[in-house]
Amino acid sequence: MKRIVIAGTSSMVGKTTISTGIMKALSKKNNVQPYKIGPDYIDPTYHTEATENKSRNLDSFFMDKLQIRSLFKKHSKNKDISVIEGVRGLYEGISPYNDIGSTASVAKTLNAPVILLMDARSLTRSAAAIIKGFKSFDTELNIKGVIFNKIRGEGHLNKLKEAVKYYDNEIEIIGAIPRDEGLSVSQRHLGLVPTPENKQGLLERIDLWGNTVEECLDIEKIVELSDKSFDFCVDEKNKDETLWKVEKNNSKIAVAFDESFNFYYWDNFDAMEENGAKLKFFSPLNDSEVPDCDTIYLGGGYPEIFSEKLSENKSMIDSIRNFDGKIYGECGGLMYLTNSIDGKEMLKLIDANAVMTPNVQGLSYVKGTFEKDCIIGEKSKEFKAHEFHYSKLININENDFSYRINRGKGIINSMDGITSKGGDIVGGYAHQHCIGNPYFAASLSKI
């Protein structure tokens, strides 16, 4: 299986722009499977638009090595090449002492060649030192190439090439991207702006990234390097092991999916469908009522940006308030379930108020334990998740929580998963993944 990892020397070096551009350029002649290392929701939306294949997350905190390999094989088996965008710097993970949660960890697990991406502003000889340092830090990694971003011009590139080749004649110089503010992408408090808000503008930007990559990088060299990757196999003893719990049901799950709610892992949807669920997508912003279903799934997103329009859609609010099935709200979905977001009236199904703050309220990988059976898990079972939010809940008049947070923050006092309506409604800040919480899809899909 051809595969390549695009890894940064740090955050903010242009990983998403250039990785997406590479995916777009390769997609003109290849069936490309995109991946994002880490728990991010937003970068995969760019990958998906560039390749027309759903981008998947690979994460060595949520997943063990066998699960990473199994998931990779599941999605890459019929593809020509897989392009894997890293997270932060190559070696950044959850600890300064190991590589769990890092790009390096996933690259080693998949025996994937790595192309190092660096911001080359004001660098010449130091670029060689950076490359040598990254290569020698962990010799199990297969760092095969380098891309220079934000170069000043041809003279700058020539000096970079001379310096790097003088000290490391084996590294492949894939090319260089010039400084151009037009190539940058908007930022918002959770990272990059999600795509549904400006679809046409985004498609034009992705075309620009793809064209720039074709002009400035050696695409054939990227394919050549990926072709040299080592093969690997899933342990035969575990080849029938499922990645998540499966209990066949015939439930209908209504999934909120629009500009305000779009933070979802596609593998969660796959897991729900494997559990027999039929997914129905709807828009809390634009539709008048929730579709016929057994369960409503309100994912994360930016409801605070659209709070006025959400509040004004009274028919949808009434439809959800009168719904007599199960409702799960996650982060942004939790906020929508409360009485209000920054004073704008919401569903009033959880007695608390959501407010935005200027500072991050929760940013962490999460470990938790279910205190009871609930609509997304089973009592005493442990799970791994992720949280990243600038909002917090105040005036909390609920005291029933479904899970305890052992690593991370949660809603209050290390508790998360506020439960109401006799357990039929659960709202939490922890973003659940069907492998980090293998009971998630089966529990949510129950009738």
Swiss-Prot record:
Highest taxon above the source species: Archaea
Entry keyword set: ATP-binding, Cobalamin biosynthesis, Glutamine amidotransferase, Ligase, Magnesium, Methanogenesis, Nucleotide-binding
EC number: 6.3.5.11, 6.3.5.12
Domain called GATase cobBQ-type: residue spans: 252-439
SS bond partners: none
Catalysed transformations (reactions): cob(II)yrinate + 2 L-glutamine + 2 ATP + 2 H2O = cob(II)yrinate a,c diamide + 2 L-glutamate + 2 ADP + 2 phosphate + 2 H(+); Ni-sirohydrochlorin + 2 L-glutamine + 2 ATP + 2 H2O = Ni-sirohydrochlorin a,c-diamide + 2 L-glutamate + 2 ADP + 2 phosphate + 2 H(+)
Record: active site: C331
Cofactor(s) essential for the protein: Mg(2+)
Annotated InterPro entries: CbiA/CobB_synth, Class_I_gatase-like, CobQ/CobB/MinD/ParA_Nub-bd_dom, GATase_3, P-loop_NTPase
Site (Increases nucleophilicity of active site Cys): H431
GO BP terms: cobalamin biosynthetic process; methanogenesis
Molecular functions per Gene Ontology: ATP binding; cobyrinic acid a,c-diamide synthase activity
Any matching Pfam family: CbiA
Keyword check for ATP-binding: yes
Role: Catalyzes the ATP-dependent amidation of the two carboxylate groups at positions a and c of cobyrinate, using either L-glutamine or ammonia as the nitrogen source. Involved in the biosynthesis of the unique nickel-containing tetrapyrrole coenzyme F430, the prosthetic group of methyl-coenzyme M reductase (MCR), which plays a key role in methanogenesis and anaerobic methane oxidation. Catalyzes the ATP-dependent amidation of the two carboxylate groups at positions a and c of Ni-sirohydrochlorin, using L-glutamine or ammonia as the nitrogen source.
Miscellaneous: The a and c carboxylates of cobyrinate and Ni-sirohydrochlorin are activated for nucleophilic attack via formation of a phosphorylated intermediate by ATP. CbiA catalyzes first the amidation of the c-carboxylate, and then that of the a-carboxylate.
Family note: Belongs to the CobB/CbiA family.
Comment field on protein domains: Comprises of two domains. The C-terminal domain contains the binding site for glutamine and catalyzes the hydrolysis of this substrate to glutamate and ammonia. The N-terminal domain is anticipated to bind ATP, and cobyrinate or Ni-sirohydrochlorin, and catalyzes the ultimate synthesis of the diamide product. The ammonia produced via the glutaminase domain is probably translocated to the adjacent domain via a molecular tunnel, where it reacts with an activated intermediate.
HAMAP family cross-referenced by the UniProt entry: CobB_CbiA
Name of this protein: Cobyrinate a,c-diamide synthase
Species assigned in the record: Methanococcus maripaludis (strain C7 / ATCC BAA-1331)
